[in-house]
Amino acid sequence: MGKYGDLMKVYKFGDIPVGVETRGVYFNDNCINYLAEKAKPEFVIKATDKDLEFEQMQSEDDQTYPKSYLEFIALYRKFCEKAIDYGVILVHGSVLEIDGKAYMFSAPSGTGKSTHAKLWRDCFGDRVTMINDDKPLIKFREDGIYAYGTP
């Protein structure tokens, strides 16, 4: 068992079932809508102390983050690195669905992606469903390109 007591659960992100070993409940609490307990994982990820240290060093400020948050970020980074092998990538953008089709607005931070998506929601009302407003997963398949929400 790890320092906080290992917890292994299966989640589905971008239609990929993945086993996730965690030290605590932060990841599990934030990903509860993605649980896929009966699915067989394609792979298993776990964050080490070294991974947590790396995430802390990557922060853009001098704040010290809780280990539970750093673990969340480290685990998600590991998933995204492996997801490429399954035709899934993480994109910085805002994705919405209208009339059965997804639309993504992608640009540098502060450009107005979320504002633009809000204008669509205001204009088209109930016809619009937000898929993800920051970092959607995009999956490339033979029958098309699919967008998925993320925790």
Question: What kind of feature is each model-predicted range?
Answer:
Residues 116:
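Hydrophobic positions on the alpha1 helix immediately C-terminal to the Walker A/P-loop
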